[in-house]
Each structure stands twice: as C-alpha cells, then as structure tokens.
Amino acid sequence: MSTDFDRIYYNQSKLGGRFRLAEGGLGWKASATGGSASTQNNEPLLLAADEVSSVQWSRGCRGYELKISTKNKGLIQMDGFQQEDFNLLKNDFQRRFNMQLEHREHSLRGWNWGKLDLARNEMVFSLNGKPTFEIPYTHINNTNLTAKNEIALEFDTQNEAYNPAGDELVEMRLYVPGTVEENEDQDQIMVKDEAEAEDGVKSEVKTEEGSEEPDVQEEKTLAEYFYEELRSKADIGEISGDAIISFQDLFFTTPRGRYDIDIYKNSIRLRGKTYEYKLQHRQINRIFSLPKADDIHYLMVLSIDPPIRQGQTSYPFLVLQFQKDEETEVQLNVEDDEFEKLYKDKLKKQYDAKTHIVLSHVLKGLTGRRVIVPGEYKSKYDQCAVSCSYKVNEGHLYPLDNAFLFLTKPTLYIPFQDIAAVNISRAGQTSTSARTFDLEVVMRANRGTTTFANISKEEQQLLETFLRSKNLRVKNEDKEAEQRLQTAFGSDSDDDDVDINMGSAGEDEESVDEDFHASDEDDDVAEEFDSEASASDSEGETSKSERPSKKAKLE
C-alpha cells in the first residue's frame, strides 16, 4: 500500500501536486486545475527505488522539504510537507528503501563565508557544519574566472523543468584567495564570498572524497582550481569532441573579442581567452546575415532572449564579422547513421563555402530559425543600408522587409508592426544640416521615440518611398512647413486673384484723410521761418500737375 501526500511542490514549481511513496519507488503528479496549460507542462515524476542515493529533511520555502539525491538524475526537491510528516516519511523510507532520512538544520547566522562542499549533485555552502545554502549543479549554466581570485556563477533561467515562483537569482560571485603548489594536499581549500572580501576572513572548500584531482604542473590560484573542479562536477564545459561542428577564432564585435564556437545538439559554447558563454538553441530568436557597407566584411547578428551576461552587462545581440571572401571547409562530427536519422534534412555532411554562409546554414538547421537577409531596399549607392548616427554612436541603418536594424553599437531592432509613425525632419538650418536629415521613429503605445540622425539628403526620397510601400505613416516636416507657408500666402490661387496684404505699399490710389484740415496758421508759420516756403509749394504743385495719371485698374 502506498503513502500519499497532497499539496507538494516539485523543484519549486508554481503548482502543487501529489507525492506518493510505494514499494517500487516514488512519484509526483501535478494537481489538475481546470486543465490549464501550466498544468500540462508539469510532467509526472517516476523514480525507481534503486535510483535513490540519499534523502534529507530540512526547512523549505513552503514548510518542510524532502531532498532526494539520485544516482543519475540529479537532485529532486519536494517542498510543502508538515512537521508531523517527518516520522511517517522516516519510517516509510526505512521500511521500503532501507534508507535513513537525515534531518539537517540550516545555518541562519547570515555570514557570507564558510566551507564549500562540491558534493555529488549539488554545491553546499555551510558554516559550522550546518548548510547555509545549496545550489544543484543542474541550475548552474556557466562559470567564468572574472579576476585572478574571483569566480562568477551564472544560473540557468531557461530550464523548462524548473519553474520557480517569483524572482530568482541569476548570478553569484565567489572570492577565492591563495595559490596551490605542486603536490600540495588538495582535500581542503580556502575560499570566501565576494561580499566578504573586505573582512579578510577565509573559509574552506571541500571536495568529495575519491574525486580525481587534476595534475598540477605549476603553481595556480585556488580560484583556477575551484573553477576547473566545478566545471567538472557540473558538466558545464562540454567535451569539444562531442560538438557537431566547430569554428575557430571568429571575430565578434559584440561582445568584442575572438572566440571559438562549438555547436552542440542543443547548445552553443563560445570560448574566449577570458570569458566563456553558453546559450541554448531555444534562446536564439532571429538570425541576420547582412553585408557591411564597406563592401569588405559581412555581418551576422544573433538575437537572443534571455541575453547572455558579463557582470552587469547583458548582450541581447551577438554580432559576428567576417571577411567577405573568407571560406571554410569543414565536416560534421557525427556518424553516418546519426546524420541520416537526425540531420539529413537540416544540414550537409560537408561544407566548402564562405564562412558566413556555412555558419548561417548550420544555425538555421539546428535552431529552426530562418536567416533574415537584406530586402528590396537599395540606397542611392546601391547598398542595403544608409549611414547615420544614433545619439553619439555612428553606424548603419538597415531597412529590412519587416523591421529596422541599426548596427553595430548599440544594436537596435525595431519591427515595423511596433511603429506608429516615421517623422522626417532637418535638425537645423545650417549649411551642414541642409545636406542631411533626421529620421524619427515613433513607437506605438507611447513607448517613446528613436531618432537616427545625419542621414544624407540624397537618401531621403528613396527611403521615404520605401517606407510608404510598407504602409508606414510617414510625416515630412519640411514639406508640411512649405505647404503651410504656401497656404498662408495664397499660393494655390491664380496670380490674378492674388491679393496679398502689403500695407500701404499696396494702395493703388491716393486717399484723403477727411479728418485732417490744414489751417492758415500753418501757412503763416512756414512763411515766417522759410522764405522759400511759397516757392516750394508752387514747385510741388507744378510737379504734381506734371505727374502722369495712373491707369485705371482692369476688372
């Protein structure tokens, strides 16, 4: 007869389920909640009795937790038990599996240093014999030596079998001081956490007994030793011989450097001199293959989500640069039977072509993403991009069939479906700005604007025509200003009907001010102070009489 427990959470899942202990093993199944899609994603767990290695009981997030260490399937966590369930579980494991249920208490002192035990399925950080926290190896996605004595651990946030509720940790750094001499006893190593570096208090790292130690040929830092040991335990660094295909010394503009690329069945690893990155195929959303405007290089852009990280910097785009005529000859590292079964319709057995074409074809086959290439747009100089600047960065804007792509730093991708309008304007009236214009992209849902400046005026008509062909709303501020000016001056009417208000300069006939009456006193004053006043008046009358009369205005 089996023993059941309800409202138990498997590996910190969002949904509870039923946990069952039986003679042949144990299992878990998510509770049905109206047939929701989230329930369907939680596959039932079945574990044979001979697969269980050890079991532990401790406090958890939702009560008490049962931690099951397996021989080949990593670590299993069952959370949500009540305190009174301990005796029942202890008796069941003893009776059914002949196994002791170990009760472990966590250290709650809050110290950031202690002993680090690289156990079979998890990394345990403990203080005074009590664990402070545990990290299963399956949750560690990558590790890097960020400094001489510093190691960064990056956690896997894309594991489909791990669905935590709420926020989760994405990175942790450890400070590991000291060095290792040749033939030095490696059983206990001093290490401390990054945040404790100022305290000067050291802790220890302890490796599992019987683990194979690497041959030390020269002095190395404890950080290097710990880094290699962790990679071995967590299987972070796949064996290069298992890679389906590899490319050597490829140049990346983002993140900048040269990296070797090893492509595996479900993941890709970038190996540089200082940093290594690992990304799953499912992280790649888009693949772009574009010629650079210098006609010498070719660019390949990978849009990835979630982005890879380097400290506080995240990289949502990976940008590779190739020589345009660079060629590669490579063969897939798979057996013929495996190729016929898995890759025949996706890849070629052997490649001999330009490097960017080979890499794009391989990525397309393994990820299932299509390769986006330049569309129908051509600039005045028959290129697929226009030179411009974004803020203080100069680059090139690629008008693709369905989006804008700005390269290279920062890389910006703006789908046309997210654009509300495009404004074309000049930044000023100087001689320099008269030869260029700005392209302002207004996003939908009040998500702000993005401005690409200093685009050559020669490209305006071609770019405007292209955008209108994509059913985008284009607003030319210069043309609208000119139309408003013409409307203000009535330029749309015939010349004969134009009657522009020009003030007194436009009067055709003289008008008499009826309110003004000249007096004799004015004449007397003129004669008194100007002896030629009368002569001037008479001359004025003479000249006035000699002036030709104006022609009558034709109606």
UniProtKB/Swiss-Prot annotation:
GO cellular component terms given for this protein: FACT complex
Keywords of this entry: Chromosome, DNA damage, DNA repair, DNA replication, Nucleus, Transcription, Transcription regulation
SUPFAM superfamilies reported in the protein's UniProt record: PH domain-like
GO molecular function, one term: histone binding
Domain of life: Eukaryota
Segments of skewed composition (Basic and acidic residues): 194-209, 541-555
Bias (Acidic residues) ranges: 520-531
Locations listed in the record: Nucleus; Chromosome
Matching Pfam families: PH1_SSRP1-like, POB3_N, Rttp106-like_middle, SSrecog
Protein biosynthesis recorded as keyword: no
Misc note: In contrast to the orthologous protein in animals and plants, this protein does not contain a HMG box DNA-binding domain. This function may instead be provided by the HMG box of the associated NHP6 protein in the FACT complex of fungi.
Subunit: Forms a stable heterodimer with SPT16. The SPT16-POB3 dimer weakly associates with multiple molecules of NHP6 to form the FACT complex.
Function in brief: Component of the FACT complex, a general chromatin factor that acts to reorganize nucleosomes. The FACT complex is involved in multiple processes that require DNA as a template such as mRNA elongation, DNA replication and DNA repair. During transcription elongation the FACT complex acts as a histone chaperone that both destabilizes and restores nucleosomal structure.
Family, as annotated: Belongs to the SSRP1 family.
Protein name per Swiss-Prot or TrEMBL: FACT complex subunit POB3
Gene that this sequence comes from: POB3
